[in-house]
Amino acid sequence: MIFPNFIKKNDVIGVTAPSDGNRKEVDFKRLILAEEALQKRGYKVRLTENVKTSENGRSSSAPERGRQLLSLIEDPEVTAITLAKGGDFLMEMLPETDFEKIRQNPKWLQGFSDSTGLLFTVTTCCDIATIYGNHFNEFAMEPWHMTQQYNMDLLEGNFPVQKSFDFYEDDFYDKITGKEPYQKDKEVCWQGTEQDLEITGRMLGGCLDVLLNLVGTRFDNVRAFNQRYGKDGILWFLESFDLNSECLIRGLWQLKEAGWFDSAVGFVFGRPCMYDSAYGFSYQEAVMSVLKQLHLPVIFNADVGH
């Protein structure tokens, strides 16, 4: 596994939009605030053009998204790349992505949600570690939440021991100034299949909604990844955006039968963003209806995802 070089003061952090770009006025405010926050920390920021454009849920055409990502990959001054936003259609740019150039120029890539399509593929196909974390605009909030602090510590090579947060934001809130912090809506309460759990493994995962689009395509390299790293054990971290119980059950079954979980040592599930069930299944019941036969530890409601 290749771990890109950690960033240091005066390095350039690149920002590009392989999914959607920014379109609201408050998002443009957040872009400026996030750039200022990272500059105060000692970094330069370089934005590609599509960070500030959005049409029909896309920052630009698929070939253009591939080109703008590549411009940062090949830029020797850029040492890390933070993706601008999530969305729905990142998968369109995967055929336009030069994965060989990414292999030759390993850099930290980070994002979440629809960004899973790029991050997961880079890790499983190129053997390059990626970060499932903040999109760029999240660095605009004042003061930073520990999420942003942990993120920067990791990029800088200071490996934090991440602990459960006290509260989490349970809804979407409109932003006015762009500096708004997370709302402390509910207390965090992790749950597990056992009272005390200790799991060790190589972490892999992302947004289930997106992973289900990758399975069985030419970008699905998980079986080979399992062969290379199976001896370490794969600790899967998974979260869903708007899968109901029926889609969740079918999706996990599909991944299991496709061999994705052949080297699994356990699972960490984030809190689902939007979830319902036609049959009255809780999220945990839906998950365990598929995974219980694996007899592996599972953690629910972790601080992962939307």
Cite the ranges covered by each PLM segment.
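ATP/NTP phosphate-donor binding region
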Residues: 1-77
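Long, hydrophobic/aromatic-enriched structural stretches that serve as scaffold segments
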Residues: 74-97
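Short, acidic/small-residue loops that bind anionic groups at enzyme active sites
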Residues: 97-123, 129-137, 293-298
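Conserved anion/nucleotide-ligand pocket segment
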Residues: 131-209
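Oxyanion-binding "anion nests"
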Residues: 202-248
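C-terminal active-site/capping subdomain that shapes the small-molecule cofactor and substrate pocket
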Residues: 244-306
